[in-house]
Each structure stands twice: as structure tokens, then as C-alpha cells.
UniProtKB/Swiss-Prot annotation:
Catalytic activity: (6R)-10-formyltetrahydrofolate + 5-amino-1-(5-phospho-beta-D-ribosyl)imidazole-4-carboxamide = 5-formamido-1-(5-phospho-D-ribosyl)imidazole-4-carboxamide + (6S)-5,6,7,8-tetrahydrofolate; IMP + H2O = 5-formamido-1-(5-phospho-D-ribosyl)imidazole-4-carboxamide
PROSITE patterns assigned to the protein according to its UniProt record, in alphabetical order: MGS
GO biological process: 'de novo' IMP biosynthetic process
Pathway: Purine metabolism; IMP biosynthesis via de novo pathway; 5-formamido-1-(5-phospho-D-ribosyl)imidazole-4-carboxamide from 5-amino-1-(5-phospho-D-ribosyl)imidazole-4-carboxamide (10-formyl THF route): step 1/1; Purine metabolism; IMP biosynthesis via de novo pathway; IMP from 5-formamido-1-(5-phospho-D-ribosyl)imidazole-4-carboxamide: step 1/1
Gene responsible for this protein: purH
Enzyme Commission number(s) from the entry: 2.1.2.3, 3.5.4.10
GO cellular component: cytosol
Keywords, comma-separated and alphabetical: Hydrolase, Multifunctional enzyme, Purine biosynthesis, Transferase
GO molecular function: IMP cyclohydrolase activity; phosphoribosylaminoimidazolecarboxamide formyltransferase activity
Source species of the chain: Desulfitobacterium hafniense (strain Y51)
Pfam families attached to this UniProt entry: AICARFT_IMPCHas, MGS
Protein name per the record: Bifunctional purine biosynthesis protein PurH
Keyword Metal-binding: no
Length: 518
């Protein structure tokens, strides 16, 4: 009796070539739906699944392969007892299962997709066959990745069978495939529930959670050479930085990815052309401009010493003029929505420079959570998305700000959100002038930012990611000539700090929203 293979795939890449090779090797093919149509149109002998089961498809195609004559043939072990049971029930063995699943991830990534349409793209029969075949790896081979087709055919041609070691590897890949698929579905449904519970007191976080991802590459090492590392893409994160395309340069490192994420997060908070230059996940220069070039030159001028070897992000296309200016300096990575052909030609001369473009196709569909590992577990929180609009700010000082001064403070406030706490940003004219990051006391960060700004602190605008516990930070700022301060407020000494602002003739506003970053 010929060996039998079930083929049921949504991704038709390499399908005909695989099926033709299996037929040449003496396999009988069983198939469903679009896969059956593709194979018959290619002139290949194939049996439709209902011919094998003797049972019609029902419920609009929801039930096709969920039948003992399919699952019995997959799950049976090569024991006398199992083989006798198959014979008694007219069931034939199935030796090879080739399945990939309904395109749920691609479906929910489409703009405007309905909840019902997403639900209909949840595969049931496919994962059932995948898991059955993977469980019975002792006898059955399961293939979920079209990239494996050539090596499967090669093994069958050269050895006459797929080795047990290879079957075990294929089974592990199959379970990872279904786990990622289920995680994508769970993430989508959880996000939908979170949206529904925004106005309720229920927690947006599920009682149990599985984190899924597909390994994109092994990295040379982690933060340090003694640490191994790898990069994984989330199952439901199309349109995000993780799905950006590297179009030039050396392989990205662990530290590159960390800094890219920090840089990309900053520029995405602005609608105007923006540029951020990052070192060790903190911005050493951030600026706005009428063009990408102007934003870059202002960001560079903010701290040209620290910018050396930095990671840069733009929320606009990098054109030739901007590329020519970038080329004059050493950077590790440049991230942008796009690079013009002329810009790429200019930057290609710096062969090691990594260029990454991230598609600008609307807001990506993903669960807005941040995950941090701790020893023995992990923490999950919502993304710190957006910030308090100017219209919701509270002016607490006697001195009142002009509209332009509020816009200056808004720029500093948007940047300070992305700086490690305790965080202070000095800015003016849409350009950071000094950044105090990661100090254990707030006045220490103020002093660092002021020292970095130097004389430019005169007339500058200061943002603090959290409240001032004492007036000392305002006193330091006023001595340097700072004009206005934006902070969340919320200290038990707010009244004392407000009194100091009035005494020092500072403008001060409260946003009533903190932006700690650890």
C-alpha cells in the first residue's frame, strides 16, 4: 500500500513542487478546499477529503477534516493493536501531514476588518491535524513551514524516509507554530475585551497569558559579549519597528535594537518632522524642524559629542540633502519611514551603517502592553501612550504663560517622557538643550541638564517627568535663567514648590500625569 499524505495549506508557496515530488515517490495525496483546487489544476492525482471520510463538509466548511478516518490515520501508532483497530474500522495510515493555518494574523492586520471576519479566520481543523501529527512524531512527519519542503523531499529521495531526528525537529516547529497562532488569537481577543472594559472597573489583563514570537535572528551577543541573545518578532505586530526592513549595513545587535526602540518611540510622539539621536536608550538630542534635515541638524547641535556612534530616528523620509549631512558623521543605525533612492546612494558609501525603514501604513494592530522580565516571572503594564494635552494643563504660578510658551513646554514634556527617571529636559525652539537622565535624586538630574545646556539655559523651558519633592530644583533652574517649568505635580510639598516658583518669577504648570521610565 502506498504511503499517504494530507496537504491542506493557506500558503501555497512551493505546494505544487512538493506534491509533484511526493507523487513521484509513490505517495497518495489527500487534500481540501483551495489546496485541492491548486493540485488538480496542476494535473496531480489527489483525493478530496470527503472521498476518504465518506462524510460531507458541513457548517459552511467549518467541519472538513475533523473525522476519525483522518485523525485515526494520523494518531495511530505502529502497534499490532492500533493497526488492527484501523483495519476493523476501514481506516488507512497517514504518514505525512503538510498544513499551515488560516491567515489570522494577516486578516486582523487589514484596516477595517470586522470582529466576525477575524473570528471566521480562526482555524480549527488545521491545528488539530498539526497537533495530532506532532504528537505522533514517532511515526508521522508534520510540516508547517514551506521552507522545509526541499529538505523533506531530499530526505525521502535519499533515505526513503524522514528520520526520527528530523521528525522530532519538525514536531517541535509545529507546536511552536500552533502556540504562536493561538497567542495571536488570544492577543486579539484580549485587546478587544480591554477596549470593552475601558469604562468598567475590570482588569484588562487576563488570568493567564502566553508570550509568543517567531525568532527572526540570533544576535552576535547580548548587552555584553558574555551574554547570548536573539531577536523575536511578535505574532500580532505588523507595522511596528520589529517588522521594519533593514536595507543596508551590518547585522543589528541587541543594543542596536534597544536604542532603535527608544529612538523610534520618541519621533512617533510628534506629528511635525522630528529627529531623535539616542545613546544607551536615552536621547542626547531631539528636535523638530520644517524638514528632516533641519530636525537632524538641530538634534545634532544639542549634543554633538554624545551623538557620536548614536542611533538616529526620523518620522519622515530621509532625502538626499539630509543623507549628505548624515554621511559626515559616524552613526550605528538610522531608522526612518523611507529613504529616497538618492539618499540610499549617498549612504551606501558607508557600508557598515545600518539603515532600517518602517512602513507608514497607519497604526499597527497590537496589544499595547509592555513586558519586563524579573527573576522567576514577568511584569505587564499598559504602554505609556500619549500624554496630557495642553488644554488639560493647570497653570499654578502667578506668572501666566503665552501660547507660544505652552508650545515650548509641550515639546520638552513630550521628550522627557522618554528619558530614564529621574528625568529632566531643557529645551527651546523645538530643540533639546540639556538632558538629565537616570539620577537617584531629581536635583542631580537638573544640575546635569543645566551643565549640558550652559549659557543656552537662559530663557529655556524645563520639563520634569515627576514632581519636585523640594524647591531646590527650581532654585537651580532659576539661577541658570530658565523661564518656565512643566511637571506633573502631586508632591505633599506642592504648595512650597509653587511658592518658590512665584518667588523666582517662574512660569509653572502641572500636567497631573507622571511619566516615570525605569
Amino acid at each position: 500500500m502506498n504511503r499517504r499524505a494530507v496537504l491542506s495549506v493557506s500558503n501555497k508557496t512551493g505546494l505544487v513542487e512538493l506534491a509533484r515530488g511526493l507523487v513521484e515517490l509513490g505517495f497518495d495525496l489527500i487534500s481540501t478546499g483551495g489546496t485541492f483546487k491548486t493540485l488538480t489544476e496542476a494535473g496531480l492525482p489527489v483525493r478530496y477529503v470527503t472521498e476518504v471520510t465518506g462524510f460531507p463538509e458541513i457548517l459552511d466548511g467549518r467541519v472538513k477534516t475533523l473525522h476519525p478516518r483522518i485523525h485515526g490515520g494520523i494518531l495511530a501508532r505502529a502497534t499490532a493493536e492500533h493497526l488492527q483497530q484501523l483495519e476493523d474500522n476501514g481506516i488507512g495510515l497517514i504518514d505525512l501531514v503538510v498544513v499551515n493555518l488560516y491567515p489570522f494574523k494577516e486578516t486582523i492586520a487589514r484596516p477595517g476588518v470586522s470582529f466576525q471576519e477575524a473570528i471566521e479566520n480562526i482555524d480549527i481543523g488545521g491545528p488539530s491535524m498539526v497537533r495530532a501529527a506532532a504528537k505522533n512524531q514517532e511515526r508521522v512527519s508534520i510540516v508547517v513551514n514551506p521552507e522545509r519542503y526541499p529538505e523533506v523531499l531530499q530526505a525521502l529521495r535519499e533515505q526513503g524516509e524522514i528520520s526520527y531526528d528530523m521528525r522530532k525537529r519538525l514536531a517541535a516547529e509545529a507546536f511552536a507554530h500552533t502556540a504562536e497562532y493561538d497567542q495571536c488569537i488570544a492577543g486579539y481577543l484580549t485587546a478587544a475585551l480591554a477596549e470593552e472594559s475601558v469604562s468598567s472597573s475590570s482588569s484588562p489583563f487576563p488570568a493567564t497569558i502566553t508570550l509568543g514570537g517567531q525568532k527572526a535572528q540570533d544576535l552576535r551577543y547580548g548587552e555584553n559579549p558574555a551574554q547570548k541573545a536573539a531577536f523575536y518578532r511578535g505574532a500580532d505586530a505588523a507595522g511596528t519597528l520589529a517588522y521594519g526592513e533593514q536595507i543596508q549595513g551590518k547585522e543589528l545587535s541587541y543594543n542596536n535594537w534597544m536604542d532603535m526602540d527608544a529612538a523610534w518611540g520618541i519621533v512617533q510622539d510628534f506629528s511635525e518632522p522630528a529627529c531623535a539621536i539616542i545613546k544607551h536608550t536615552n536621547p542626547c538630542g531631539t528636535a523638530l524642524g520644517k524638514t528632516a534635515l533641519e530636525a537632524y541638524e538641530k538634534a545634532l547641535a544639542a549634543d554633538p559629542v554624545s551623538a557620536f556612534g548614536g542611533i538616529i530616528a526620523f518620522n519622515r523620509t530621509v532625502d538626499a540633502e539630509c543623507a549628505a549631512s548624515l554621511k559626515a558623521h559616524f552613526y550605528e543605525v538610522i531608522v526612518a519611514h523611507e529613504f529616497s533612492s538618492d539618499a540610499r546612494a549617498i549612504l551606501q558609501e558607508k557600508k557598515n551603517l545600518r539603515l532600517v525603514k518602517v512602513a507608514q501604513d497607519g497604526k499597527p494592530a497590537h496589544t499595547p502592553w509592555k513586558v519586563r522580565s524579573i527573576q522567576g516571572g514577568f511584569l505587564i503594564q499598559e504602554e505609556d501612550e500619549g500624554t496630557t494635552p495642553i488644554s488639560a494643563w493647570e497653570v499654578v504660578s502667578k506668572r501666566q504663560p503665552e501660547p507660544e510658551e505652552l508650545r515650548e513646554l509641550d515639546f520638552a514634556w513630550r521628550v522627557v517622557k522618554h528619558v530614564k527617571s529621574n528625568a529632566i529636559v531643557l529645551a527651546k525652539a523645538g530643540q533639546t538643550l540639556g538632558v538629565g537622565a537616570g539620577q537617584m535624586n531629581r536635583v542631580g538630574s537638573v544640575k546635569i541638564a543645566l551643565e549640558q545646556a550652559g549659557d543656552k539655559a537662559q530663557g529655556a523651558y524645563l520639563a520634569s517627568d515627576a514632581f519636585f519633592p523640594f524647591p531646590d530644583s527650581l532654585e537651580e533652574a532659576a539661577k541658570a535663567g530658565v523661564r518656565a517649568v512643566v511637571q506633573p505635580g502631586g508632591s505633599v510639598r506642592d504648595a512650597e514648590v509653587i511658592e518658590a516658583a512665584d518667588r523666582l518669577n517662574l512660569i509653572m504648570v502641572f500636567t497631573n500625569r507622571r511619566h516615570f521610565k525605569h
